[in-house]
């Protein structure tokens, strides 16, 4: 007879090859048809909520690897929580207002001058929705489960309505005010410009080095030095109020031509060369931070210029001492706010100097350059004048140069709530811990928040003006505008006159004649997304504020984490989140930033096309995502190899359960053979470790633990020796059923454990588990596995861990014999061991299983370790002799034994196989 027919070889339709790029979309289609998101929500209804609030990506362009990392991390957490006792809704969002969309339309050839603001905004909205639909499909392809049909979108009427309420609440508390801030200003078109309305062209400008005499050295300088600044805008010198230095840079006091000057050490050589200093002596070196609060004198006005510290100071050019005019520069303004400097802006809207620049009033700023340079020369402050050609911002419409000029803007006060903000930070859990220090320092040091923008595409600032120009913000106007936006969307602001946006019959003391105008500025987009705690968490029934977790890239400490905190504390006095987790950036394999010019961009869509989403998700689980992470073809190849091993382990287990029904064939757990109970204990440890790692967001541990469990515990040990029993023994053999019981428990538990990370593969395994006890149609509809109680667990672990060490010794000896060509496969070997006393006791207790456990044909426990023959390999706990086994090879189980052929009916079989065949396969 053909003995092959009597072997119980693995049978499963679970394919060896993942073929994920083809199979994943089929699995996703099944999820969609099942409406899996709804099913999960229904199943977990009534459980405690766990809300991970999605930070909205900007609706523009295809998703990049940073998006993929972010969304996959969120999805892993949400999937785990919904399998471990929580109801975990996930509502994805999109950020849709702002400059990039305006710019994208302009690039597409939209001529905004030929249409009304309302018409242009309709095109912006249309474009945003196109981008959302594109990104939504890409996010879904990653396997991210969420309420994709009901996302939150910052341009939706209900969102804008809530945002207006946030603004109104802040205004009511006195946190919204008007103040000055420098913006791009075009004297030629007499208006503020957005960055999108700027184009860079070459311009010839004066380049001057100016000396500011020290007035009070604060014990750091002697008082007879001069601080040297460099600028290409002499017209801003009348507005100078400070000199900025970098706190961490070295500065030097140098003596030349009988005078002492202060410059950055790193720039001394270039400054000396430029000004023409011959012999220079370094008098002393000082850190920038030690120069803070030194007082210098303005070169030609009777006022002070304070030395301040600023992180924006560089050593790229100039002197390292930066002329600071808060009315004429973004950095100057921000650092000036920190030090409480005035915002002096002696230039009018047409670009002419005002009376705040005595001596230069009435001069066009460009002409003032010459007059001011002459004045500096007269007072002996000009060290060098030359001319340079450099790239300079111009008005894209008039093609004329722009200037930075302080204009009136709307602000949200951070100062008034700084204490509450810092307290809220303390009450929040920050992961990693350095996140707390980072955001604490940002909030501690930040100035007030400029929330107005002179653009078209955004949420209008809901302010009206009376006849005397006084701003009007009342509970009544806010409520009315919020309701209008909820009904019509914010475009209504641009379609109606002020009177038609106010409540009927509205009156105000500032407008005796009932004439009102409206604000035309819009809100900063960070105010949009920063209001999501109210516009999403409070607005929607399935969510709650505060969220349990915000999870974004580390750039969001200054972005969304910050703006959300500011608006939430302003409105509720509390943070909008209980915990904040941040991840790093995605770099290439060499640790370089990805860029088109370097050609090192790895695109998620490409990876999914070639390898599949589960490989990308496994990569996310493999990296230390709290720092910057690396990705490349070779890194993905390594991950794909780990995936292959995990998949093959699943396949082996599934294949060997084809004739197993847990209801009828399972062996009670405490009746399992000891080695099988040991594997259950190993499985218990895996379950505990993996669940703990999910709880602490430590996915890399899961990656390593699952990989080790599959390759070391299962493939290299348990499954390896189990084959002999699974394939060879009779179907109902107790040892075989014992192993199958372990395989069943393992495959079910392992599928659940990896489901949050590898949802497609887990789903596929789930479908292929024969006679599954849990009838749920998806692995997403069950909970994480529980550990299985085993009697005398500690004793089993101690004994079998010791055996595994012994096994390593014997395997080493087998490897040596194989390399020396003494044996071929291990089944051709006969092993004799000379154990130590402890080892003898251990081996003696499992003597009858040793041949199977070591996959050899003969295993003998001989004399004590001390009496081992000379030629034995001496290892830690045993001395080992390996020789070829004597006898014939059994045709059915391949064991080598002299007893082959003892049964005349089956001359090529060993007695064990002959017995099995006679009992179970004879006609």
Swiss-Prot record:
Coiled coil: none annotated. The gene is ileS. Monomer. It is found in: Cytoplasm. IleRS has two distinct active sites: one for aminoacylation and one for editing. The misactivated valine is translocated from the active site to the editing site, which sterically excludes the correctly activated isoleucine. The single editing site contains two valyl binding pockets, one specific for each substrate (Val-AMP or Val-tRNA(Ile)). Keywords: Aminoacyl-tRNA synthetase, ATP-binding, Cytoplasm, Ligase, Metal-binding, Nucleotide-binding, Protein biosynthesis, Zinc. One of its GO terms (cellular component) is cytosol. This is Isoleucine--tRNA ligase. It comes from Geobacillus sp. (strain WCH70). It is an enzyme of class 6 (ligase). It catalyses: tRNA(Ile) + L-isoleucine + ATP = L-isoleucyl-tRNA(Ile) + AMP + diphosphate. GO terms for biological process: isoleucyl-tRNA aminoacylation. The keyword Transcription does not apply. ATP binds at residue 596.
């Amino acid at each position: 007879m053909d003995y092959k027919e009597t072997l119980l070889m693995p049978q499963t339709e679970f394919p060896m090859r993942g073929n994920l790029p083809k199979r994943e979309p089929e699995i996703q289609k099944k999820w969609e048809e099942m409406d899996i998101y709804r099913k999960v929500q229904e199943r977990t209804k009534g459980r405690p909520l766990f809300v991970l609030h999605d930070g909205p990506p900007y609706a523009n362009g295809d998703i990049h690897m940073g998006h993929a990392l972010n969304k996959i991390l969120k999805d892993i957490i949400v999937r785990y929580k919904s399998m471990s006792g929580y109801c975990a809704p996930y509502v994805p969002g999109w950020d849709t207002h702002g400059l990039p969309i305006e710019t994208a339309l302009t690039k597409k050839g939209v001529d905004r001058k030929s249409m009304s603001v309302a018409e242009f905004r309709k095109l912006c909205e249309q474009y945003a929705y196109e981008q959302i639909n594109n990104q939504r499909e890409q996010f879904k392809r990653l396997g991210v489960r969420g309420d994709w049909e009901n996302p939150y979108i910052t341009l939706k009427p209900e969102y804008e309505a809530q945002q207006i309420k946030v603004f109104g609440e802040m205004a009511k508390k006195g946190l919204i005010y008007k103040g000055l801030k420098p913006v791009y200003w075009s004297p030629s078109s007499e208006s503020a410009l957005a960055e999108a309305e700027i184009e860079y062209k070459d311009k010839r400008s004066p380049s001057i080095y100016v000396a500011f005499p020290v007035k009070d050295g604060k014990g750091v300088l002697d008082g007879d030095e001069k601080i040297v600044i460099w600028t290409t805008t002499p017209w801003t010198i009348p507005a100078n109020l400070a000199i900025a230095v970098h706190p961490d840079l070295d500065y030097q006091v140098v003596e030349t031509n009988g005078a002492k000057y202060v410059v950055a050490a790193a720039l001394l050589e270039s400054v000396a060369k430029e000004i023409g200093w011959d012999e220079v002596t370094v008098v002393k070196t000082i850190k920038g931070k030690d120069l803070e609060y030194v007082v210098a004198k303005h070169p030609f006005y009777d006022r002070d210029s304070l030395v301040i510290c600023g992180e924006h100071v560089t050593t790229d050019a100039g002197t390292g001492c930066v002329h600071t005019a808060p009315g004429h520069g973004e950095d100057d303004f921000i650092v000036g706010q920190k030090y409480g400097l005035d915002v002096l802006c002696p230039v009018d809207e047409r670009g002419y100097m005002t009376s705040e620049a005595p001596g230069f009033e009435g001069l066009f700023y460009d002409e003032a350059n010459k007059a001011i340079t002459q004045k500096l020369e007269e007072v002996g402050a000009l060290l060098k004048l030359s001319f340079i050609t450099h790239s300079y911002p111009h008005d894209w419409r008039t093609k004329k140069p722009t200037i930075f000029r302080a204009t009136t803007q709307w602000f949200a006060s951070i100062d008034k709530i700084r204490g509450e903000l810092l307290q809220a930070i303390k009450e929040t859990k920050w992961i990693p811990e350095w996140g707390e220090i980072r955001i604490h320092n940002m909030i501690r040091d930040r100035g007030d928040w400029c929330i107005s923008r002179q653009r078209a595409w955004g949420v209008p600032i809901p302010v009206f003006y009376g006849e005397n120009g006084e701003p009007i913000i009342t509970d009544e106007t806010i409520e009315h505008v919020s309701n209008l936006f909820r009904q019509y969307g914010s475009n209504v602001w641009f379609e109606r006159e002020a009177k038609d946006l106010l409540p009927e019959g509205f009156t105000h003391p500032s407008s005796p004649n009932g004439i009102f105008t409206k604000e035309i500025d819009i809100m900063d987009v960070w105010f949009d997304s920063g209001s999501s705690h109210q516009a999403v968490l409070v607005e929607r029934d399935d969510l709650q504020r505060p969220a349990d977790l915000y999870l974004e890239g580390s750039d969001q400490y200054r972005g969304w984490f910050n703006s959300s905190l500011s608006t939430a504390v302003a409105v509720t006095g509390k943070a909008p989140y209980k915990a904040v987790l941040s991840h790093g950036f995605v770099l290439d394999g060499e640790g370089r930033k990805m860029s088109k010019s370097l050609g090192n961009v790895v695109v998620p869509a490409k990876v999914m096309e070639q390898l599949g989403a589960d490989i990308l998700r496994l990569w996310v689980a493999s990296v230390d995502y709290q720092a910057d992470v690396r990705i490349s073809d070779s890194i993905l190849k390594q991950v794909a190899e780990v995936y292959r091993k995990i998949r093959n382990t699943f396949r082996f287990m599934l294949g060997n359960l084809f004739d197993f029904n847990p209801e009828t064939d399972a062996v009670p757990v405490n009746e399992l053979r000891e080695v099988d109970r040991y594997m259950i204990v190993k499985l218990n440890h895996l379950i505990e470790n993996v669940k703990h790692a999910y709880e602490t967001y430590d996915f890399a541990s899961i990656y390593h633990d699952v990989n080790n469990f599959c390759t070391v515990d299962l493939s290299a040990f348990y499954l390896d020796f189990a084959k002999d029993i699974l394939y060879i023994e009779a179907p109902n053999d107790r040892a075989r059923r014992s192993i199958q019981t372990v395989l069943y428990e393992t495959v079910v538990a392992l599928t659940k454990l990896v489901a949050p990370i590898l949802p497609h593969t887990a789903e596929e395994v789930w479908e292929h588990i024969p006679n599954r006890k849990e009838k749920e149609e998806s692995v997403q509809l069950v909970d994480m596995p529980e550990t299985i109680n085993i009697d005398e667990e500690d004793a089993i672990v101690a004994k079998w861990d010791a055996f595994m060490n012994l096994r390593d010794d014997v395997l080493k000896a087998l490897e040596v014999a194989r390399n020396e060509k003494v044996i071929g496969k291990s089944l051709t070997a006969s092993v004799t061991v000379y154990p130590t006393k402890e080892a003898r006791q251990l081996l003696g207790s499992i003597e009858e299983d040793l041949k199977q456990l070591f996959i050899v044909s003969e295993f003998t426990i001989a004399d004590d370790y001390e009496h081992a023959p000379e030629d034995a390999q001496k290892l830690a706990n045993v001395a080992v002799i390996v020789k070829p086994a004597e006898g014939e090879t059994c045709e059915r189980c391949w064991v080598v034994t002299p007893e082959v052929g003892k049964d005349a009916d089956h001359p090529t079989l060993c007695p064990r196989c002959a017995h099995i065949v006679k009992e179970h396969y004879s006609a």
